[in-house]
Amino acid sequence: MVKPIIAPSILASDFANLGCECHKVINAGADWLHIDVMDGHFVPNITLGQPIVTSLRRSVPRPGDASNTEKKPTAFFDCHMMVENPEKWVDDFAKCGADQFTFHYEATQDPLHLVKLIKSKGIKAACAIKPGTSVDVLFELAPHLDMALVMTVEPGFGGQKFMEDMMPKVETLRAKFPHLNIQVDGGLGKETIPKAAKAGANVIVAGTSVFTAADPHDVISFMKEEVSKELRSRDLLD
């Protein structure tokens, strides 16, 4: 069984007020924070690194953190690693507060070894594929994953147009692995979320559509309901 998970991408936030921006979307109903890490090599853009994640973790504790005596908003940190040689970053990001390390299939020579390395650090392991990568590459790996990510834009920049022709990949994964968390990332908003939900995605990354919304709660609630409706129709809703 799976559940709807909304993971706003902090790439679309106001970095001058990052902690407050994250509290805003968590209080509006976000489940995870999607943290895009780009190295300027695997993708042309550069975003943020471990010091920012460490700092943000102090502002946004893990759910269930007993030391959170101030009752700060909490969230699961979903780190999307758009980097070359992702193996070299696993230990650092596990230490700085990542809850999940999502690597790109295209960036590693031995994805299964990388999954085992990630899990050995006590965090969840996920694998992403670019639009040009066949979904077939995930079939042997999926039983070992906590999540699969199907990119619905070319990775590297926010605010791109949703690629509807990626939905057959999601449909295939949901049919083969009904209880796997399947994430979509890129161009997701009120107009496109029904297509992603119908295909079988349950983890939704949304950036500008949430962070710049007049009412983030309304957007997040709509997304959750669309995903819940489709999961319910498949008898998969947790």
UniProtKB/Swiss-Prot annotation:
Residues where a divalent metal cation binds: 34, 36, 80, 185
Gene3D superfamilies named in the record: Aldolase class I
EC numbers, comma separated: 5.1.3.1
Function according to Swiss-Prot or TrEMBL: Catalyzes the reversible epimerization of D-ribulose 5-phosphate to D-xylulose 5-phosphate. Involved in the protective response to oxidative stress.
Chief location of this protein within or outside the cell: cytoplasm
Cofactor list: Co(2+); Fe(2+); Mn(2+); Zn(2+)
Class of the enzyme per the UniProt entry, highest EC level: isomerase
GO MF terms held by the record: D-ribulose-phosphate 3-epimerase activity; metal ion binding
Pathway membership: Carbohydrate degradation; pentose phosphate pathway; D-xylulose 5-phosphate from D-ribulose 5-phosphate (non-oxidative stage): step 1/1
Active site as annotated: 36, 185
Organism: Saccharomyces cerevisiae (strain ATCC 204508 / S288c)
SUPFAM superfamilies: Ribulose-phoshate binding barrel
Note: Present with 3310 molecules/cell in log phase SD medium.
Entries under PANTHER family matching the protein: RIBULOSE-5-PHOSPHATE-3-EPIMERASE
Known catalytic reactions: D-ribulose 5-phosphate = D-xylulose 5-phosphate
Domain of life, per lineage: Eukaryota
Gene: RPE1
InterPro entries reported for this sequence: Aldolase_TIM, Ribul_P_3_epim, Ribul_P_3_epim-like, RibuloseP-bd_barrel
Subcellular location: Cytoplasm
Descriptive protein name: Ribulose-phosphate 3-epimerase
Protein's GO biological process: carbohydrate metabolic process; pentose-phosphate shunt; pentose-phosphate shunt, non-oxidative branch
Cellular component, GO annotation: cytosol
